[in-house]
Structure formats: structure tokens, C-alpha cells
Amino acid sequence: VAERAGIPFVNGSSSSPALTERGLKYFFRVSPHDGQFTKLMFDFLDEFQKKKNIKISSASILHEDSAFGTDSATTQEKFINDKKYKLLNKITYNAKATSLSSEVQKLKASNADLLLPSSYTADTYLFLKTAKELDYNPKMLLAQNAGYTDPAFVSTAGKDAEGAITRSPYNDDLAKRIPNLSKVNE
């Protein structure tokens, strides 16, 4: 709509790389896209493996079926291949699903070293609840923002949130040390 009307659209949160790869004249992003975030996630994995002297050799992707989840999964798959990890699963589900039992059973059966979920808040809670019920405990969970960075995530998920690692465009810990950072984020 903004493109047709010739009105600049400043996007503060959508992270799909496709949005800036379409050649739109009036679309502007003020934060990194999933390609940049995912690169940093995999840089973190490289460092983590060195520091902890562990080896990650396999991964599974779990994502909801919107542009966010699909584009995120596509980007993650590229990095998995580039890093020579074995992709064991790439599982898509409807974000409004009322059950993730079959998806979690597949993840549990494959037992990948790394789980990369891309989910919104409600499906993040559904995944965690289902994983607990089915005793699925991924060795490492590295999430793509959204549901895992919802302000209520830790308080709502409680102990089930422990061990989840996520990327975020904003860091509250940094804001405590750099007072003006919160103003910039607003």
C-alpha cells in the first residue's frame, strides 16, 4: 500500500530478509534482518563450542508457517549447510495449532544437537508445554526472537524457560549501563 501511494514506510520490527530484497523504493528497515541475526547466532555457536569444548554436528528447525517463520527457517537452513551441520528436521506448523505433539515427537526421535525454533508467543508456550509432557529436552535451543523475547516469557514459562537462548534486537542489560539506549529503542 505504501509503495503504491509513494509514502515512506519505516519498519521497526519485521526481520524477514525478503522485505528489503524486493527492491521497494519506500520501504525502510531500522533494524537488522534475519540473515544478519542468524549470522550472529551461528558466530555465537562457533564461540560457544570453542569455549565449552563441545561439538554441534546436527540441527533441527521448527517454525511456524507465516513469512516470519518460513523466511527465518530458510535463512537458518542456509547457515546450517554453510557450517556443515547435518539438518535432521525442518518442521513447519500452523501458528494457531492447538497441538504440537507430532512435531515434538519428530524432534525427540531425531535428537539433534541444536534446535532452532521460530515461533510467536502462544506457540512458544505450546511447544514448551508439549516438550515437557513428552520429555523432550533439546541439548541446545537457540531461538529466533519473537515468542522467546516476549516480556512475559520468563515469568509465564517459569522453569521451562531455563536454558533457552534467543537473539534480540535490543538488550535490557546494555540499557542499564547506557541510559540513552532505552530512549533510542523507544
What are these regions (language model features)?
Residues 1-3, 98-99, 105, 110-134:
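Hydrophobic alpha-helical
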Residues 1-90, 140-174:
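Extracytoplasmic ligand/sensor domains, especially the bilobed periplasmic-binding protein
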Residues 71-75, 102, 126, 179:
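Generic recognition of short, well-ordered alpha-helical segments
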Residues 89-99:
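Short beta->alpha junction loops
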Residues 104-108, 156-157, 179-183:
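Short, surface-exposed amphipathic charged segments that create phosphate/polyanion-binding patches used
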Residues 115, 138-141:
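Aromatic-lined carbohydrate-recognition surfaces of secreted/lumenal glycan-active proteins
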Residues 121-124, 173-186:
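Extracellular/periplasmic ligand-binding modules, especially the Venus flytrap/periplasmic-binding
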